[in-house]
Amino acid sequence: MEAKIVKVLDSSRCEDGFGKKRKRAASYAAYVTGVSCAKLQNVPPPNGQCQIPDKRRRLEGENKLSAYENRSGKALVRYYTYFKKTGIAKRVMMYENGEWNDLPEHVICAIQNELEEKSAAIEFKLCGHSFILDFLHMQRLDMETGAKTPLAWIDNAGKCFFPEIYESDERTNYCHHKCVEDPKQNAPHDIKLRLEIDVNGGETPRLNLEECSDESGDNMMDDVPLAQRSSNEHYDEATEDSCSRKLEAAVSKWDETDAIVVSGAKLTGSEVLDKDAVKKMFAVGTASLGHVPVLDVGRFSSEIAEARLALFQKQVEITKKHRGDANVRYAWLPAKREVLSAVMMQGLGVGGAFIRKSIYGVGIHLTAADCPYFSARYCDVDENGVRYMVLCRVIMGNMELLRGDKAQFFSGGEEYDNGVDDIESPKNYIVWNINMNTHIFPEFVVRFKLSNLPNAEGNLIAKRDNSGVTLEGPKDLPPQLESNQGARGSGSANSVGSSTTRPKSPWMPFPTLFAAISHKVAENDMLLINADYQQLRDKKMTRAEFVRKLRVIVGDDLLRSTITTLQNQPKSKEIPGSIRDHEEGAGGL
């Protein structure tokens, strides 16, 4: 059963009509999978002085109404499923002013019969006001004003059911910096966060979240240049130069014993790396690529980051309780500059930027701490040739061995949490979408530049005409894809931030490659490859995008062996020029 679990607070007296007033949490929405809850403390009846709180609050000199957004049909279906599966509600809560408060005990007693009958709508009175508990829509309806308030409950089996909560058009009173008067900053801003809190024993867990939802990005990260929301905006050269730092020694001089390589280490979730340790980890992991200039290492540092870390550590405890071992690891996540500032505020699900499909499935793809060069291939390149990688703590829990189902987007069973490519020595981790905001904590951002990066396919490189392939380089790396100008170009290719050259290996036409792999690839996969190739020829797909999809479908090992075999064969009859199309969107490897 899927259940919604958030901060639950017992009430001891009625100051606002539904329970003791507590420090307001941040504008977070919370929802997670079901966790069993033990019996909770009873709530004493309110005193006679309770009053219904005003629905409007004054913020920054203006009256703003806390908006509870319309739910989608999908959410209503989910709520209906909750209602069908739930037992008898033993504890009912309302979400007001940023916190959950209990429905008083005497009201629960008054509507006990309706609760036991599992009535979809129950009418009751409190402090002279009439309300309806709408369990199907998970809301409480004020019959006088029509105001709706989110509704949650805990049943007799200890299962918690919470809706999705949204708050917009307001700023928290706990901001520690003054928000600039700007139309963009004052625009409605929704924040949604997945969190999971286990409720057990007679204690009620408490978690205070303080946040400033400042879209300007101020105080979002310490020492990390914050990205603007629009991808059309660019870094200022002077700003970049002032932020950049050079490695004091070449990568080749780093001693591997000095680096902290934790891909196989079992962490408790409490270890904290410093920037120097992250530099060493990155340097050792990319040593096979040659000298990799690290421009900067920044830590996500803000009140929001601290709140997310607290949630992550709570999730570690929960996973450890249910699995025996949380199995926390460090892992690398490729990132785009324009979404970095939104990661802490909106989570890794922001715009779907981190969700990717591969031969292992659909989800958040990370690589082991000692294999950053694998993630580097998916890093976008900004206009200054800078790439970005995020070092994350990841709760892997019980790991599932993934067997190449590209359509898989959730675990293969309740006994698994996330997936890996190898149980004993994993290099690729997949965190399913349902866990992406609870099982991953982004901690550091590494800004770096690379020349002749194997398999790096940035957005700007994708605009070039042709791509070549060479098999030189580290043995464990896939073929190197290099950007170069086509026959119409000037003869030199200057991809952004690097000095790539023409391919060192002979040019390989796509049709020749397809013919060679056709008997080794499934028929459906070949149909997909041919369809993508047609889009490439029609200029509906960039070359870099096509090559990336080809590598995902076929696999780097098969491409490597096939290209090597074809290159070692005697030269055959010249391929017709109609096939060897040098226009953008065609050609070969």
Curated annotation (Swiss-Prot):
Q: Which residues form a coiled coil?
A: none
Q: What induces it?
A: By ozone, salt stress and cadmium.
Domain of life of the organism encoding this protein = Eukaryota
Q: Where is the WWE domain?
A: 64-153
The annotated phenotype of a deletion mutant is: Small plants, altered leaf shape and early flowering. Plants lacking RCD1 show enhanced resistance to methyl viologen, tolerance to freezing and supplementary UV-B irradiation, reduced sensitivity to abscisic acid, ethylene and jasmonate, increased sensitivity to ozone and up-regulation of reactive oxygen species scavenging enzymes.
What is the documented function of this protein? Answer: Inactive ADP-ribosyltransferase that functions with SRO1 to regulate oxidative stress, hormonal and developmental responses. Required for embryogenesis, vegetative and reproductive development, and abiotic stress responses. May regulate several stress-responsive genes. Seems to play a larger developmental role than SRO1. Does not bind NAD in vitro.
Q: Does the keyword Nucleus apply?
A: yes
**UniProt source species:** Arabidopsis thaliana
Describe its assembly: Interacts with the transcription factors NAC013/NTL1 and NAC046. Interacts with dehydration-responsive DREB2 proteins and a number of transcription factors belonging to several protein families. Interacts with turnip crinkle virus (TCV) movement protein P8.
Pfam families, alphabetized: PARP, RST, WWE_5
Report the residue ranges that make up the RST domain in this protein.
501-572
- Where do Polar residues bias regions lie? 481-503
Extent of Basic and acidic residues compositional bias: 571-589
Q: Gene encoding it?
A: RCD1
Task: State any single GO MF term.
Answer: NAD+ poly-ADP-ribosyltransferase activity
Query: Sorted alphabetically, which InterPro entries does this protein's record hold?
Result: Poly(ADP-ribose)pol_cat_dom, RCD1/SRO1-5, RST, WWE_dom
Record GO biological process: defense response to bacterium; embryo development ending in seed dormancy; ethylene-activated signaling pathway; jasmonic acid mediated signaling pathway; lateral root morphogenesis; nitric oxide biosynthetic process; programmed cell death; regulation of reactive oxygen species metabolic process
- Keyword Plastid (UniProt): no
Main localization of the protein?
nucleus
This protein is called Inactive poly [ADP-ribose] polymerase RCD1
Q: Which UniProt keywords apply?
A: Developmental protein, Host-virus interaction, Nucleus, Stress response
